[in-house]
């Protein structure tokens, strides 16, 4: 994750170099950088993470789309996720993944119960395919 990497440090041949590692995905976080960074790196194994809270875990509904795989972070949890999903559907954003690090913690500790609750919700909403036939 190239979070907070000053654009001056980016190698002009970065796209070429990243393609040498096709089994790895490189994520460019677009919170502290200009959003162009994730889009300008032209390698198939790159994606963009948009976190308007700059890693502070604060929910925002200021969504943006990108011309490559992308995901969202920032205050997502079991309470805010349905609101976010409704917005993504309404705006037809088609995001690919979410980052919920703080949203699955209870008093700073990772909670498998919270993860399970979120996965069950996402499966019910059709965002995760469980292997079972859907009606």
Where are these regions (language model features)?
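Conserved anion-binding
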Residues: 1-71, 77-80
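Glycine-rich phosphate-binding active-site loops on the catalytic face of alpha/beta enzymes
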Residues: 1-6, 52-59, 72-73, 77-78, ...
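A generic structural motif
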Residues: 27-33, 51-53, 98-105, 132-135
């Amino acid at each position: 994750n190239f979070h907070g990497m000053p654009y001056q440090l980016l190698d002009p041949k970065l796209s070429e170099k990243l393609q040498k590692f096709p089994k790895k995905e490189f994520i460019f976080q677009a919170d502290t950088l200009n959003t162009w960074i994730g889009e300008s790196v032209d390698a198939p194994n790159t994606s963009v993470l948009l976190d308007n809270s700059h890693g502070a875990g604060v929910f925002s509904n200021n969504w943006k789309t990108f011309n490559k795989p992308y995901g969202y972070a920032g205050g997502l949890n079991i309470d805010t996720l349905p609101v976010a999903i409704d917005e993504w559907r309404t705006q037809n954003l088609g995001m690919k993944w979410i980052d919920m690090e703080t949203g699955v913690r209870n008093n700073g500790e990772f909670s498998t119960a919270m993860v399970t609750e979120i996965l069950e919700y996402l499966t019910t909403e059709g965002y995760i395919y469980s292997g079972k036939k859907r009606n």
